[in-house]
Amino acid sequence: VKIIDLKETMYSDQTGKFPYLSSRGNRYIMVAYHTDANYNFMEPMKNRTEAQMLKAYQAIFERMKEAGLGVRKHILDNKISAEYKAAKKKNVAEHELVPPGEHRRNIAKRAIQTCKDHFVGVIAGVHESFPMHLWCRLLEAAEMQINLLRQSNITPKILAYAHVHGPHNFMHKPLAPFGCPVQAHQKPGK
């Protein structure tokens, strides 16, 4: 997808219900896409109530701010309440609603599909003894992994992950298959 003149734009939407309730009470994921970084942000939500959506949006927006990503425009689905609109005005200069029936204009739909496909692959690859109620704890690692596979739109020679977090140090955070059983050796007497 070639993006032209959408600097500092954010798209967001929520996924459908996850089949398992997580140990933290989460059932949904809010996915946000930042056009400059080409980065997909994922934040778990307990339900699709206004309070949970605002909490997830605020968490994602704070992460964008910490990374130095500007957001001047927020494009979202055509369902939005006055409370949600007011919270956005504090953070973003303008917002735009995708017209009903024009979901192909919401890049977040494509980001959701990419994240869902990747996360299904992650879940399919976990060990058979992995407790599925821990699925939301895999989100951070899945987000990191998916963004290590994408290039930034602003600086195509670096990864989307590096655009947001800086270069990944594989010695500090090695990547192993998610949800795999591990054995830890503990020396006696320590």
Task: List PLM regions with ranges.
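Charged, gly/pro-enriched flexible loop segments at helix/strand junctions
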Residues: A124-P188
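Retroviral integrase
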Residues: V1-D117, H163-K190
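A polyampholytic, Gly/Pro-enriched intrinsically disordered region
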Residues: T114-V126
